[in-house]
Amino acid sequence: MAEATEKWGIAHIFASFNNTIITVTDLSGAETICKSSGGMVVKQARNESSPYAAMQMAINIAQASKDKGITGLHIRVRAPGNGRQRSPGPGAQAAIRALSRAGMRIGRIEDVTPVPHDSIRAKGGRRGRRV
């Protein structure tokens, strides 16, 4: 049998509307290989969640992963979830696209946003938000 030349890792992408955080771990998730956040690549706080910041982070992450010997990534996308937003922010899709363009092999892409089974009490009180 041929020797496996690929080494896989997991890219955890947390994408909210305020920030995007990418962490690369080994397959067990126990050892962190590299990580980056929006504040590390842009100056203004309002740009931390932008697709541009996500692309720059993904390029840095891909380079650091290759230096450590990782050739492929499984991707786990997470939004804030629970009582907050359940859809990922604008940086998630841009980060995945930039990782594949940077030469990383993409394995599985899964959504790991926490979803409540009974929900928590909604923000805004009994009468709701009055506009």
Curated annotation (Swiss-Prot):
The UniProt function text for this chain reads: Located on the platform of the 30S subunit.
- Molecular function terms in GO for this entry? rRNA binding; structural constituent of ribosome
Q: Which family does it belong to?
A: Belongs to the universal ribosomal protein uS11 family.
Q: In its UniProt record, which GO terms are filed under biological process?
A: translation
What InterPro entries does the annotation carry?
Answer: Ribosomal_uS11, Ribosomal_uS11_archaeal, Ribosomal_uS11_CS, Ribosomal_uS11_sf
Q: Name one GO cellular component term.
A: ribonucleoprotein complex
Keywords (A to Z) from UniProt: Ribonucleoprotein, Ribosomal protein, RNA-binding, rRNA-binding
Q: State the name under which the record lists this protein.
A: Small ribosomal subunit protein uS11
Keyword Repressor part of the UniProt annotation: no
Task: Quote the subunit structure annotation.
Answer: Part of the 30S ribosomal subunit.
Against Gene3D superfamilies, the record matches this protein to: Ribosomal protein S11
